[in-house]
């Protein structure tokens, strides 16, 4: 037993040593945001695309630390903006993880792919789960699919509902996310109801969520809510109350306009209050 423990501890120490020794001076400078030191190292000929044993690049480290000036310097020197770690993590994913809109913008301006492959960690899902609505907006503006569906995670909207990040939920809905699309048969409304998050439940219903949708257990959202909770009570009242005609008309108009043309609503010959209403402003 003692020999086994000794071997395990030895391996841990070796792994830690490899990690430390595998980090380059560029990694250290990027991690600490030391721009002058980083530039000097680049001028000395250090490879900006050097990676650790886990394929972590200096650009990964700079973005994780929200060091946008270091990220710019690395990219200007030829750093690969789409480099991935052994886990498939990109610098853009790291930027979205910490809510660094500046780093995300720099990466996207220099060719970073706004959307991951299905089997890779997804920047828009990460931003949605962390409540980083600025990154969500940036990714969508650069072409990320607002309804990007990853089998084990669902859509960004579903992820935001599970994490109870109302600002991200609102941003995704305003950008045209499908309010019915969640994970498998579970809708975003089911997720919000299960979390007893009445504010998100109200928001989803405002955008036309189906209160009668059934999940894989054949439950409606009201049945998925915790018993005797505020959300359960709200949904029971909502089910028994006729919806305003204005709300139904807004949903119908937005459906007809289509997500790709939402930006044209501002150009419709309508009074400003009505245009604002159609855009949930």
Locations of regions flagged by a protein language model:
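Ankyrin repeat start-site detector
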Residues: 21, 53-54, 86-87, 119-120, ...
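Cullin-RING E3 adaptor/co-adaptor recruitment helices
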Residues: 207, 212-281
């Amino acid at each position: 037993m003692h020999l086994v423990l000794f071997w395990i501890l030895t391996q841990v120490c070796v792994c830690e040593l490899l990690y430390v020794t595998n980090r380059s001076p560029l990694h250290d400078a990027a991690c600490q945001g030391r721009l002058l030191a980083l530039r000097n190292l680049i001028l000395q000929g250090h490879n900006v695309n050097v990676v650790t044993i886990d394929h972590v690049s200096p650009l990964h480290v700079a973005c994780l630390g929200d060091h946008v000036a270091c990220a710019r310097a690395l990219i200007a020197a030829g750093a690969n903006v789409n480099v991935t770690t052994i886990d498939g993590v990109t610098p853009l994913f790291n930027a979205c993880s910490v809510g660094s809109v500046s780093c995300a913008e720099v990466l996207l301006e220099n060719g970073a792919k706004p959307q991951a492959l299905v089997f890779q960690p997804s920047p828009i899902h990460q931003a949605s789960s962390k409540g980083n609505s600025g990154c969500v907006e940036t990714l969508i503006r650069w072409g990320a699919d607002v309804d990007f569906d990853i089998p084990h995670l669902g859509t960004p909207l579903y992820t935001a509902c599970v994490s109870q990040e109302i600002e991200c939920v609102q941003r995704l809905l305003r950008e045209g996310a499908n309010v019915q699309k969640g994970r498998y048969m579970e809708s975003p409304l089911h997720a919000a109801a299960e979390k007893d998050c009445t504010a998100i439940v109200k928001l989803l219903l405002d955008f036309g969520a189906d209160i009668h949708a059934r999940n894989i257990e054949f439950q409606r959202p009201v049945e998925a809510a915790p018993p005797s909770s505020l959300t359960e009570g709200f949904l029971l009242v909502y089910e028994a109350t006729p919806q305003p005609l204005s709300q139904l008309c807004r949903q119908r108009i937005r459906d007809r306009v289509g997500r790709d043309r939402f930006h044209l609503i501002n150009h419709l010959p309508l009074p400003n209050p009505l245009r604002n209403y159609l855009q949930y402003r």
